[in-house]
């Protein structure tokens, strides 16, 4: 929070500021299901991380040249082995089942599409009236078990048994209407997952 305040106190020294937010800004102690950016002022996170992200998201709206990109989950090639999709591949290669501790509905967004959104903003922030707070999510919503199914439907992937310890839990997803309205040519979930598989080793 102090870092953000330091940056905005020097806004006169640069043209635009991009910040990254988390779905935790909506309070992970509550249900977060296809939540709209407009709900940020109605949520009060209980931990320091979520609260700081929430306060920054509110502050962003006071400035015309500050933009806030919110991620709920992110994936991309070269990610560490414990990440969800890479661990699916590694467990399958080792003939090990993959354990889902809580089968929540969750949004994941590819790093390639993060870069595409950022480039769109860099090229258009001073030409168009762009949303200053935006969820980076795809329209389709999946639970973790179904996301594993999407991943294993990619040609060449090898499926592994999935063990679900708890069949449901609080959702962690955002509304993607603002992003869809921008009509950016995104690669999407399936193509992004195929890229992760292609660069698995």
Predicted segments with their positions:
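Active-site helix of classical SDR
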Residues: 48-52
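NAD(P)-dependent short-chain dehydrogenase/reductase
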Residues: 58-106, 111-115, 119
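A structural motif corresponding to the C-terminal end of an alpha-helix
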Residues: 7-16, 56-66
């Amino acid at each position: 929070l102090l870092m953000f305040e330091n940056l905005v106190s020097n806004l006169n020294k640069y043209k635009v500021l991009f910040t990254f937010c988390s779905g935790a800004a909506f309070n992970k102690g509550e249900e977060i299901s296809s939540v709209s950016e407009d709900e940020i002022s109605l949520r009060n996170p209980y931990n320091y991380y979520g609260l700081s992200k929430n306060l920054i998201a509110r502050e962003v709206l006071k400035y015309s040249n500050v933009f806030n990109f919110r991620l709920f989950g992110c994936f991309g090639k070269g990610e560490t082995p414990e990440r969800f999709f890479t661990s699916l591949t590694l467990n399958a290669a080792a003939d090990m089942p993959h354990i889902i501790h809580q089968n929540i509905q969750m949004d994941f967004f590819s790093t390639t599409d993060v870069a595409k959104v950022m480039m769109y903003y860099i090229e258009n922030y001073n030409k168009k009236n762009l949303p200053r707070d935006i969820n980076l999510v795809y329209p389709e919503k999946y639970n973790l078990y179904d996301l594993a199914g999407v991943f294993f439907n990619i040609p060449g992937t090898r499926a592994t048994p999935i063990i679900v310890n708890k069949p449901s839990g609080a959702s962690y997803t955002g509304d993607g209407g603002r992003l869809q309205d921008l009509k950016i040519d995104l690669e999407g979930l399936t193509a992004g997952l195929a890229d992760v598989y292609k660069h698995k080793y």
